[in-house]
Amino acid sequence: ADIGAGTGYYSFKLSDKLPQGKVYAVEIQDEMIAVLKKRKAALRNRNVEIIKGSAMSPNLPGYSADIVIMVDVYHELEYPHEMLQSIKKVLKKDGKLLLIEYRGEDPAVRIKPLHKTTVAQLNKELSANGFTLYYKGGFLPIQHFLLYEKK
């Protein structure tokens, strides 16, 4: 599930790699949902399902996702606690949550501070909501790549 799918860049990339699977493209903005629908039709895609989410929930069935990704989305959440609790219900038993966020610790990352997040802050918030850090990738030049699992 790609929460905050936007134009579907990651949703459709994942779809190509998982032709027998299902990819949920979750978006709250109607304009982006329209873009997703047009793109899905243009690509004749059959395994991306477009979902209208809300500020508090991705509106997905329980235990329906092996992985949830949020790319440059977490810092934008209006209700992070509620969203994380909803994501916990969506993830399958061994499911994972992937967050990619701009590095708040690095002043060289030329992004407005309100669009950056530190690992310490993410770990604190995720831990308080029943997640633990599973893997931290250091291969992206200006972003964190953090994979969490349910406690």
Enumerate the language-model features and the residues they cover.
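A short glycine-rich, Lys/Arg-flanked "PGG" loop and its adjoining helix->strand segment in the class I
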Residues: 81-96
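Helix-to-beta-strand junctions that scaffold the AdoMet/dcAdoMet cofactor pocket
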Residues: 18-19, 77-78, 91-93
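Glycine-rich phosphate-binding loops of nucleotide-dependent enzymes
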Residues: 4, 65, 135
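A short acidic, Gly/Pro-enriched loop at the edge of an enzyme's catalytic core
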Residues: 58-68
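Core SAM-dependent methyltransferase catalytic element
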Residues: 129, 134-151
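Class I SAM-dependent methyltransferase SAM/SAH-binding core
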Residues: 1-58
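A short beta-strand submotif of the Rossmann-like class I SAM-dependent methyltransferase core
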Residues: 67-71, 83
